[in-house]
Amino acid sequence: MSPDQEPAPRSTDPGKPAAARPLRAHARRNREKLIAAARAAFTAADDGAPLEGIAREAGVGIGTLYRHFPTREALVEAVYAAELEAVTADVTALLDELPPERALRAWMERYARFVATKRAMVNTLHSGWASGRITAPATRERITAAIGSLLAAGARTGALRGDVEADDVTAMLLGVFLSTAAEGDPSRTGRLLDLVVDALRTPVPSP
């Protein structure tokens, strides 16, 4: 067995598929390294990056890559899922570190990066959307839930308005990203995100 090979999982239940069981630690590390290498490759180029190069960058053989991800689509979808999980999980940590209004702005920046890197994978992601393996409504629900947590925290402190629907903010952000997609100008995206946050602040009472 070569260093990058993973032992085939053994089942004590012949009726249970091997893929349904948790990965062993070595296999899990290899999977994480492959996703990290693929994320870097897709961000730097596009989802046409050679799989052999991704495996080499991850420090594993091409056979290991195909054991985890039988198709390019499976790898792209895994990168998408990992990044979506990361961007939605950031909310708790940001609220622990920053006031809600600043946490919201920082999270928007991370979400903008998430959206920007997906442009390089969009052709392959289309097949996932078409097949139902990736659902746009589910993605939007998770993003909206993250925004809702940030808005609720801001409303509790009085820093952010309490009369705004989280899904309306999701729509605003998608509008920002769509309007700036062709420009590739992060500074303009940042200015527009500042305007969104300003619109969400609790109005200062008139004297």
Regions found by a protein language model. Give the residues of each.
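C-terminal peripheral helix-coil segments that are non-catalytic and often amphipathic
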Residues: 1-18, 113, 145, 149-157, ...
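Basic, helix-initiating cap at the start of DNA-binding domains
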Residues: 1-57, 74
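Short hydrophobic/aromatic patch on the recognition helix
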Residues: 59-69
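A secondary-structure capping/hinge motif
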Residues: 73-75, 120
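Alpha-helical DNA-contacting segments of helix-turn-helix folds
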Residues: 76-83
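Hydrophobic alpha-helical connector segments
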Residues: 78, 92-117, 135
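Amphipathic alpha-helical packing segments from all-alpha helical-bundle domains
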Residues: 85, 117, 131-167, 171-174, ...
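Short linear capping/connector segments at secondary-structure termini
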Residues: 124-132
